[in-house]
């Protein structure tokens, strides 16, 4: 065998190995590929991805907090969901606690970077109020 045929055999072997590895990766991730395609199938012919979704890998207010009580979370309160932490409740303005009908709405509001909301802590002035007792119970 001359050197050129050895080189061609090596190149062909490497190409076949790369193809086999790619097929194996597709086989291993087939469920994830199907899920991604079904999620984004409506966008197949669109020029931009114009959907209302939050990529929580980029911004999460809990990323730099080490104390568990300081982390923001959504909890059920009076058949609505509210966003709470040790700092208090997320509020519309003043003492109006922001209520959400679904937990997804609460999560989207709490973890959206564009949302700069006020925080209302009922335990500062009235330590015995219903809101303060609830806040202490979930922390």
From Swiss-Prot:
Residues on Virion surface side: 22-139
One GO BP: membrane fusion involved in viral entry into host cell
Record carries keyword Transferase: no
Post-translational modification: Contains two intramolecular disulfide bonds. They are created by the viral disulfide bond formation pathway, a poxvirus-specific pathway that operates on the cytoplasmic side of the MV membranes.
Pfam families reported in the protein's UniProt record: Pox_A28
Gene Ontology CC: one annotated term: membrane
Transmembrane stretches, start-end: 1-21
UniProt topology in membrane: Single-pass type II membrane protein
Keywords, in A-Z order: Disulfide bond, Fusion of virus membrane with host membrane, Late protein, Membrane, Signal-anchor, Transmembrane, Transmembrane helix, Viral envelope protein, Viral penetration into host cytoplasm, Virion, Virus entry into host cell
Location of the protein in the cell: Virion membrane
Membership in a protein family: Belongs to the poxviridae A28 protein family.
Record's function text: Envelope protein required for virus entry into host cell and for cell-cell fusion (syncytium formation).
Protein name listed in UniProt: Envelope protein A28 homolog
Organism: Yaba-like disease virus
